[in-house]
Swiss-Prot record:
MF terms in GO: 16S rRNA (guanine(1207)-N(2))-methyltransferase activity; nucleic acid binding
CDD domains named in the record: AdoMet_MTases
Catalytic activity: guanosine(1207) in 16S rRNA + S-adenosyl-L-methionine = N(2)-methylguanosine(1207) in 16S rRNA + S-adenosyl-L-homocysteine + H(+)
Enzyme class: transferase
HAMAP family reported for this sequence: 16SrRNA_methyltr_C
Transcription is among the record's keywords: no
Self-association and partners: Monomer.
Protein's cellular compartments: Cytoplasm
Alphabetic keyword roster: Cytoplasm, Methyltransferase, rRNA processing, S-adenosyl-L-methionine, Transferase
A Pfam family hit: MTS_N
Annotated source species: Escherichia coli (strain ATCC 8739 / DSM 1576 / NBRC 3972 / NCIMB 8545 / WDCM 00012 / Crooks)
Function: Specifically methylates the guanine in position 1207 of 16S rRNA in the 30S particle.
Name of the protein in its database record: Ribosomal RNA small subunit methyltransferase C
Length: 343
């Protein structure tokens, strides 16, 4: 991270106002402004592991990663700068959590791109910190208010649940496919062979639906799941537990925390990071898979048909197959052979 997002550029127009402030940065932290802005003190809280990785290198323990912020995470802060995400329920979860911890009188700034729906912050916070728009630039809005009343926050009330073919899927705000199984994952699931054995890694696991569906037909697989999102990690753990499926689940920026090799890697990789389109995660997944597959192991991913993954697959593995497709999605399969580049 070096270039600033439009939201951060709007904040920089007001940088003089923050020099004496003890700031908590939270929300969709897409750059390292929290580490670079001139303030009296800065902390950051994020639910995204890859954002925490960047910020913690510069901020140390003042950058925190977790699903729910605690009193220690906001200690001594007199100002909140919240970057609005594209997902309104995610904003609700995070803001109610943070405002329940910050003292009355805290200055509240909310910034975000207009297309993300940042305007709805006014209505969301009306009972706690009435907001006024104080700047508009770079297709972003900046809102300011002061905390007048702490909300009551109960994380348990944000859990959702749905069923897929008799399986229970637990979800939280900010988790991909929160309201039901997406078409791409359905297509990938249709290609999985029953009675598969071996070690399976589910990268970008979301709510864990791919893993539990796979395990139902292949109970002898040994599952490992990872995601950059704290809500996804917690949702996957809950989904596994709800279906009596065992597996290890942890936060990881693609393979950053993954150890060892697997017989199969499955993924429905993201191509958005917040409001921005990003193919980085999927390309890192494909290129890094060769370091985490056993000989003869396979990578199986589903992706929008228009995304340019065949070239990366061929470059990395020497070849690929399309084993299922619709008008919108393709399921790609690549096998770890001697042709594959060993990372």
């Amino acid at each position: 991270m070096s270039a600033f997002t439009p939201a951060s550029e709007v904040l920089l127009r007001h940088s003089d106002d923050f020099e004496q402030s003890r700031i908590l940065f939270a929300g969709d932290l897409q750059d390292d402004l929290p580490a670079r802005l001139d303030t009296a003190a800065s902390r950051a809280h994020t639910q995204q592991f890859h954002h925490w990785q960047v910020l913690s290198r510069q901020m140390g323990d003042n950058a925190r990663f977790s699903l729910v912020a605690t009193a220690d995470d906001v200690a001594d802060c007199d100002t909140l700068i919240y970057y609005w995400p594209k997902n309104k329920p995610e904003a609700q979860f995070q803001l109610m959590n943070l405002l329940s911890l910050l003292p009355v009188g805290t200055d509240i700034f909310v910034v975000g791109e207009n297309r993300s729906g940042v305007r709805s912050a006014e209505q969301m916070l009306a009972d706690y910190a009435p907001l006024n728009k104080v700047d508009s630039a770079r297709r972003c809005g900046l809102y300011f208010g002061r905390l007048e009343k702490q909300p009551v926050f109960d994380a348990d009330k944000f859990w959702g649940e749905y069923s897929v073919d008799g399986l229970t899927v637990k979800t939280l705000p900010g988790v991909f496919s929160r309201d039901g199984l997406d078409v791409g994952s359905q297509l990938l699931l249709s290609t999985l062979t029953p009675h598969t054995k071996g070690k399976v890694l589910d990268v970008g696991c979301g709510a864990g639906v791919l893993s539990v569906a796979f395990a139902r037909h292949s109970p002898k697989i040994r599952l490992t799941l990872c995601d950059v999102s704290a809500p996804a990690v917690e949702a996957s753990r809950a989904t596994l537990a709800a279906n009596g499926v065992e597996g290890e689940v942890f936060a990881s920026n693609v393979f950053s925390e993954v150890k060892g090799r697997f017989d199969m890697i499955i993924s429905n990789p993201p191509f958005h990071d917040g409001m921005q389109t990003s193919l980085d995660a999927a390309q890192t997944l494909i290129r890094g898979a060769v370091r985490h597959l056993n000989s003869g192991g396979e990578l199986r991913i589903v992706a929008n048909a228009f995304l340019p993954y065949p070239d990366v697959l061929d470059e990395t593995f020497g070849f690929h197959e399309v084993i299922a497709q619709t008008g919108r999605f393709k399921v790609y399969r690549a096998i770890m052979t001697r042709q594959a580049k060993k990372g």
